[in-house]
A protein has these predicted regions:
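Basic, alpha-helical nucleic-acid-binding regions used in initiation and control of genome expression
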Residues: 1-329
Length: 329
């Protein structure tokens, strides 16, 4: 990206610091609109790099030089700047961040030049009314609700169904296509079960460790690997429909199949599909591993299917499968 910080760069009139859990892109967006400059124009003035940082997923691809410009321009410590990036989840949510590739749990934006082709950024309409900015958590695959307002997160405009593309909008926090304010988006209540499930995930992410049944995860990455593996066997594969049906019959939920996606990753599902999926995941993983074993056995999800497409499954998951689902027919 940027080779050096421009030596003549002086602080901007905008000196706002990142808000709690704010994404880098959101912080930059607020700066641009506060100074009444189009985001792409401000990006060109600030970075003068090829390719322009804003034509990529800047929350995942911004390097130290990009951060230094923002740090100097807003008089913000570099440590605060780094916390706005998705890479700050490294060793907590995933093992290694991939700046120019797919990272586990990070929802893809499908950026092509200035266009976003995938609903990879979510929002809570009540948060947009109370404290309008985009949170890092809203890019995480298992995040489907706002635990503050107890609402389901949206990944498209409620009026026209366009994806969220902040840099293309003429004003902050409105739809770039129909200009509807995101604060006026549909407010869909989340179930008590899903609010509690997400609170647990957020606590694990913040604390860096987890307990699942009798298994203790000293590093939260190991827990989130297990969570993702259970989500994938519920969402994809020849036995996934039977597994979902079993879970719903035993403990409730919605067995509707998620829309197919070429990536076969839970992060690539839309917000409705992920909400239904993680509702099933939460029901399946209670009383671990008992419910999972009962459901998998009933669905004939034996070891060969449970380990499919994963040469290095999480240890806790692999141990349960090997002990209780060893049949191969």
């Amino acid at each position: 990206m940027l080779d050096v910080v421009p030596p003549t760069l002086t602080p901007w009139p905008f000196r706002g610091r990142p808000k709690a859990d704010e994404l880098f892109s959101s912080w930059f967006l607020r700066a641009a609109h506060a100074m009444e400059i189009k985001p792409y124009a401000l990006g060109h003035i600030s970075w003068r790099s090829t390719p322009p940082p804003l034509t990529r997923d800047i929350d995942g691809s911004a390097d130290e030089q990009v951060l230094k410009v923002m740090s100097r321009a807003t008089v913000t410590p570099m440590a605060d700047c780094r916390r706005t990036l998705l890479s700050s989840y490294e060793t907590y949510l995933f093992e290694a961040h991939q700046p120019l590739g797919r990272t586990t749990w990070v929802m893809p934006l499908g950026v092509r030049a200035r266009s976003r082709n995938h609903p990879g950024l979510q929002f809570c309409p009540a948060c947009m009314a109370d404290a309008p900015y985009y949170r890092r958590l809203w890019r995480v695959g298992w995040a489907t609700v706002c635990t503050i307002h107890r609402l389901r997160l949206l990944d498209r405009c409620s009026q026209c169904a366009a994806v969220v593309a902040p840099f293309q909008a003429p004003a902050a926090f409105v739809c770039h296509f129909c200009l509807a304010p995101f604060a006026e988006g549909e407010r869909r209540p989340a179930s008590n079960e899903m609010v509690e499930f997400q609170r647990v995930q957020e606590s694990i992410l913040a604390n860096g460790w987890a307990q699942l049944g009798e298994s203790c995860f000293p590093y939260s990455v190991q827990y989130f690997q297990t969570l993702r593996r259970v989500a994938r066997v519920l969402a994809f594969g020849p036995r996934s429909a039977a597994l979902r049906d079993t879970v719903v019959a035993q403990w409730g939920g919605d067995s509707q199949a998620p829309a197919s996606n070429a990536l076969r990753d839970v992060e690539a599902l839309n917000s409705d599909d992920r909400y239904r999926l993680f509702d099933l995941v939460s029901r399946t993983m209670r009383s671990w591993p008992d419910r999972f074993v009962v459901a998998a056995s009933s669905a004939r999800l034996w070891r060969s299917w449970a380990m499919r497409d994963d040469p290095m499954p999480p240890f806790v998951y692999a141990d349960v499968v090997s002990r209780y689902l060893a049949r191969s027919i």
